[in-house]
A protein has these predicted regions:
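Bacterial N-terminal signal peptides
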Residues: 4-15
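Eukaryotic scaffold repeat domains enriched in small/polar residues
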Residues: 19-364
C-alpha cells in the first residue's frame, strides 16, 4: 500500500511539473502619433529602429523607393528627437542604399546600418558622416550583375564580403559582430579598426549552423545571441564562436490568433513535427534586443502570432505582450526592437510602416 502511494505521489508530481506554467501578460501602452513627420515625408516598411544616449530615435525605412517593382532601391535613414520631432535625413542618396535592413547605435553613439540589397554595412559618426564601410555591392556595369539570382548551391563565402547581411552588435573591446545573413549563414567578427578576424557558421539546423541569422545582440559578459529565425531558436556563443546553448520560445498560441498577413499557419499536432524553414512558426525570433546592464533582460518578437516576449538571458520567458493587427498595441511583423531600458522599447514594423514607442508596466 505504501509503495502504491509513493508511486501515485511521484506520478502526480511529475504531471504537475510537466505542465507549461502560465506566462504573464505584460500590460503596456503605445504612445499615440509618436513620430511627427513633415508633410512631404513618408515612411515605407520600417526595417530598423535605434535609440542613442540622447534618446534620439533613428528609423531605417524602405521609403524613398526608386526603380522597378523588383530590384528597387528602398532605403532611407531618418533621425527624430526624444519627443518624436523630425530632425534630419542621414545619407541622402548614399551609394550603399538599396534595401534597408537594420540600424544600431554603439556606445559612442555612432550609427551602423545593414543593407540587405547592397550587401553592405555602413558606420556613420555622430555627425552623420560615413566613418567605415564593410562589404561591396555589385557594380552596375558588370555583365553578370543579377542581385535577384540565388545560385544553388550558394557560392562559398568570402572574407570581408556579405550576402544579404542582416544585423550588427559589439562587445566591450569594440569588436563588431555581423550576422551574414540570408545566404552566407554565418557570423563575422571584425576588430575596432575594421580588420577581419574570423567567421563561424554555415547553413543547417545543428548547433553552430543557421537558417537566416536575422538579428544579433551581446550581453555584458560578451556572449553573442543570434536570432536563428528559420530554425526557430536563439543560439548563444562566446566571443570566439564557441556554442554555449540555445533558447526556444514555447508559449501557447490563442486558437483565435490571426496572422498579420497571409494564411494562418497550420499548427495541428497531427501534422507531425515542424520541419524546414520555421520563419512563421510561433516563437521564431525575428528581432532580439538586450537591455543595458546591470539587470539585463532580452526581448524577442515573432511574425506569428505577432507577439513580443520578455526573457531572462538563460531563456526563461518572463512575460508576453501584443498580437498581430493594424491598431496601436498591435503589430505587423516587427523587424527590429530597440530597448534602451527594461520598460521602454521601440519597435519597427514592416507591414504597418511605423515605429511604436511602448511603455511597459513594471513587474511587481
Amino acid at each position: 500500500m505504501r509503495s502504491s502511494l509513493i508511486l501515485f505521489f511521484l506520478s502526480a508530481t511529475s504531471f504537475l511539473f510537466a505542465q507549461p506554467s502560465r506566462v504573464p501578460e505584460i500590460q503596456y501602452q503605445s504612445v499615440p502619433d509618436f513620430l511627427k513627420l513633415p508633410p512631404d515625408l513618408y515612411l515605407g516598411e520600417v526595417a530598423g529602429v535605434a535609440v542613442n544616449s540622447k534618446r534620439h530615435v533613428f528609423v531605417f525605412s524602405r521609403g524613398n523607393s526608386t526603380g522597378p517593382a523588383y530590384g528597387a532601391s528602398a532605403a532611407q535613414l531618418l533621425e527624430f528627437d526624444a519627443d518624436g520631432r523630425f530632425l534630419r535625413e542621414i545619407g541622402h542618396n548614399l551609394y550603399a542604399w538599396s534595401f534597408a535592413h537594420t540600424v544600431k547605435v554603439d556606445k559612442e553613439d555612432n550609427l551602423w546600418v545593414t543593407d540587405k540589397g547592397s550587401d553592405m554595412v555602413i558606420k556613420f559618426n555622430r555627425e552623420g558622416r560615413v566613418a567605415m564601410v564593410f562589404g561591396r555591392k555589385q557594380e552596375a556595369s558588370d555583365e553578370g550583375t543579377a542581385p535577384l539570382k540565388h545560385p544553388k548551391p550558394p557560392l562559398p563565402p568570402v572574407d570581408g564580403m556579405f550576402r544579404q547581411v542582416t544585423d550588427v552588435a559589439w562587445d566591450a573591446a569594440g569588436n563588431t559582430y555581423i550576422s551574414d545573413g540570408y545566404i552566407n549563414s554565418r557570423i563575422a567578427k571584425v576588430d575596432k579598426n575594421g580588420n577581419w578576424l574570423k567567421s563561424w557558421g554555415e547553413a543547417g539546423d545543428q548547433p553552430g549552423q543557421f537558417s537566416t541569422p536575422h538579428s544579433i545582440a551581446l550581453d555584458a559578459a560578451g556572449n553573442v545571441y543570434v536570432a536563428d529565425r528559420g530554425n526557430r531558436r536563439i543560439q548563444v556563443f562566446d566571443g570566439d564562436g564557441k556554442f554555449l546553448r540555445q533558447i526556444t520560445i514555447d508559449v501557447p498560441v490563442d486558437p483565435n490568433a490571426r496572422p498579420a498577413i497571409g494564411n494562418k499557419p497550420n499548427l495541428s499536432a497531427s501534422d507531425g513535427p515542424v520541419t524546414g524553414n520555421q520563419t512563421m512558426a510561433p516563437g521564431a525570433p525575428w528581432a532580439i534586443c538586450i537591455t543595458p546592464p546591470p539587470n539585463q533582460v532580452m526581448y524577442s518578437s515573432d511574425g506569428y502570432p505577432g507577439r513580443i516576449y520578455k526573457l531572462t538571458l538563460d531563456g526563461k520567458v518572463l512575460g508576453v505582450l501584443g498580437e498581430s493587427g493594424k491598431q496601436l498595441k498591435q503589430f505587423g511583423w516587427i523587424h527590429e526592437i530597440a530597448c534602451p531600458s527594461e520598460n521602454e522599447i521601440y519597435v519597427g514594423e514592416l507591414l504597418n510602416w511605423r515605429v511604436q514607442k511602448l511603455i511597459l508596466e513594471p513587474s511587481h
